[in-house]
Regions:
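Short glycine/proline-enriched coil/turn segments at helix->beta-strand junctions
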Residues: 30-35, 68-71, 93-95, 151-152
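A metal-dependent, Asp-based hydrolase signature
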Residues: 3-44
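Short, acidic loop-to-helix structural element flanking the phosphoryl-transfer center
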Residues: 19, 43-74
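Hydrophobic alpha-helix position signal
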Residues: 28-30, 66, 88
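Soluble or luminal CAZymes and related metallo-dependent hydrolases
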Residues: 17-21, 51-58, 110, 114, ...
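Asp-based, Mg2+/Mn2+-dependent phosphohydrolase catalytic module
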Residues: 79-182
Length: 182
């Protein structure tokens, strides 16, 4: 699976479909099992992933309870729109005012074209009212850096390896192996 995943990701380097588990399974099992079973594998993969993922319910409750009418929650993500909406609804995260996926933009974070598209929505809200920007994510370069540079956003970087949030005054290593003081 991992070898096929890396092959697909190399082939679809700048394409949001590079995260498609369906494409991984299709390439992995091509001519070995029928297409229905390949499709069923993808469904089973996401069913198990969604059910087994542990969501910090305390943090979710805090986000929901602290959200006021003037607050806007945006989610910008590299993944298939269908899968992201499935995860959002299954995990009780249906409080975002706007969700933008790389699939619908045609570019992935950290591509500037992705941020330009997402920022057109953020900039419109910032212009209308006195707004504070908070960037939350598990990858500094993908989730936080742009928003800090453009809006001096406060950040909250989540370390998935430790499953604990890191304070914004921490040195971290992102998925590329690059270290940053945040």
């Amino acid at each position: 699976y991992e070898k096929t995943k890396h092959t697909v990701q190399a082939r679809l380097l700048d394409n949001p479909s590079r995260h498609s588990k369906l494409i991984y399974f299709k390439d992995l099992f091509n001519e070995k099992i029928d297409l229905k079973k390949i499709h069923d594998l993808e469904i089973m993969y996401w069913d198990v992933f969604i059910k087994s993922t542990q969501i910090d319910k305390k943090s979710i409750k805090l986000l929901i309870n602290r959200k006021e009418n003037k607050d806007f929650y945006f989610l910008f993500t590299n993944q298939n729109t269908n899968i992201q909406l499935r995860k959002i609804n299954s995990w009780g995260l249906n409080f975002f005012d706007l969700v933008i996926t790389s699939e619908e933009v045609g570019f992935e974070k950290p591509d500037k074209k992705f941020y330009d598209y997402a920022d057109s929505y953020v900039a419109a809200k910032v212009k209308k009212m006195d707004t504070k920007i908070y960037a939350v994510g598990d990858d500094y370069r993908n989730d936080i850096k742009f928003w800090q540079n453009k809006y001096n956003a406060r950040s909250y970087l989540i370390d998935n390896k430790k499953l604990e949030p890191l304070s914004s005054n921490t040195s971290v290593t992102d998925s590329t192996g690059e270290s940053f003081d945040v």
